[in-house]
Amino acid sequence: MLLQVILEGLGLGALLFLVCAVGIRKGAVGMVHLYSPAVQQRCVKLGLTTHEKIKRNALIFKAVCIPGYIAYVLVCVYGINGAKGFVQGFWQLLVILSVMNLMDRLLVDGYWVGHTNAWTIPGTEDLKPYITAKDKQKKWLFGTVGMAVIAAVLAEMMTVQ
């Protein structure tokens, strides 16, 4: 069962990669809502986007990703794996979300954003690194504590009679 749950986590990570790839398909400015306010402001100043487009893309991203990811993990854990009760649901949700979080931190943030030009926005190179050490600390903290909280909330919701 553990291997299956890890594979489901890899599947969720693949969905994350797909969302990111679609988001930057016409250039990284398409996902500038994930960047710092300084980068966003520079993009607006350079005429690459507007504050309205940034807000719109952020809302679309949240409206698609959050429900999509929640649906994915719930279908995997309760629909496919048949988890019963809080504990079974919690550990499976936590593993799936943690695997995705590791992929996000190491592969997306660490490699794709940090070591390739795919996420470079022309005219903002002087603002690199786009993900600062402080940002990384916050993401790791949320990724560990936050995913546990999300797993607990979802598991509790699924066990309420």
Go through the PLM ranges and name each one.
Residues 1-12, 57-90:
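Long, highly hydrophobic alpha-helical transmembrane signal-anchor segments
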Residues 6-30, 96-112:
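Hydrophobic alpha-helical membrane-embedded segments
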Residues 15-57:
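Interfacial loop at the N-terminal end of multi-pass membrane proteins
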Residues 24-32, 78-82, 109, 113-117, ...:
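Transmembrane helix-loop junctions in multipass membrane proteins, especially transporters and channels
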Residues 40-54, 120-137:
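Short membrane-interface loop/juxtamembrane segments of multi-pass integral membrane proteins
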Residues 50-64, 131-148:
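Loop-to-transmembrane boundary segments
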Residues 86-92, 103-124:
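Membrane-proximal helix-loop-helix units in multi-pass membrane proteins
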Residues 152-161:
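Juxtamembrane boundary at the C-terminal end of a transmembrane helix
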